[in-house]
């Protein structure tokens, strides 16, 4: 079990070793996932496990649990069992807790499935507002793919951020990934509209 205080990973110096930076990124993503959804229930996030047992990528996803009283976040892989506890996350820029956005009476929230590659691209979008960031990090892993839950307005807003980043991306390969994510989200939005 990896016991960590997120405050130790927040402002790493420029010369910090690569493994420390990767661990800081993973812990930050776990905190984002755990705080993007409600407290009190363990759930399987779309975050992939970073371990490589037998020098092969672990196929598991990270299960997160945040108790009602914010003290620590527990996480573990649903496949290999790797896990830990994170403290010192409250108030950090990874903390996505916020009151839910008020919904209009006629708004319906729909679940839609996207491939894991699309979910990974969405987590790498650099400019997201807090509502879209919560949408991306509360995605759940299933056997069919990654399930995002959103209403039409949330999905449309996320599409705008993905399109803006794709239009300004100089790396052709990353732009293609963003374009595929945009196409998958557009299909989901059209499905919601019909």
Residue ranges: model-predicted function:
Residues 1-45, 89-103:
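Short, intrinsically disordered terminal segments enriched in charged and Pro/Gly residues
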Residues 2-3, 89, 94-194:
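Positively charged, low-complexity terminal tracts
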């Amino acid at each position: 079990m990896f016991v960590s205080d997120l405050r130790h990973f927040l402002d790493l110096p420029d010369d910090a070793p690569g493994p420390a930076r990767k661990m800081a990124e993973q812990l930050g993503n776990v905190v984002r996932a755990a705080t993007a959804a409600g407290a009190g229930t363990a759930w399987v996030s779309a975050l992939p496990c970073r371990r490589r047992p037998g020098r092969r990528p672990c196929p598991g996803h990270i299960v997160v649990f945040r108790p009602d009283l914010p003290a620590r976040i527990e996480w573990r892989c649903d496949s290999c069992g790797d896990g830990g506890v994170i403290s010192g996350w409250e108030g950090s820029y990874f903390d996505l807790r916020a009151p839910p956005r008020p919904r209009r009476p006629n708004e319906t929230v729909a679940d839609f499935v996207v491939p894991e590659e699309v979910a990974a691209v969405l987590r790498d979008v650099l400019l997201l507002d807090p509502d879209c960031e919560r949408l991306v990090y509360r995605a759940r892993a299933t056997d069919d793919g990654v399930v995002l839950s959103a209403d039409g307005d949330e999905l449309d807003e996320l599409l705008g951020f993905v399109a803006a980043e794709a239009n300004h991306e100089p790396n052709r390969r990353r732009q293609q990934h963003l374009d595929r994510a945009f196409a998958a989200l557009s299909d989901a939005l059209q499905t919601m509209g019909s």
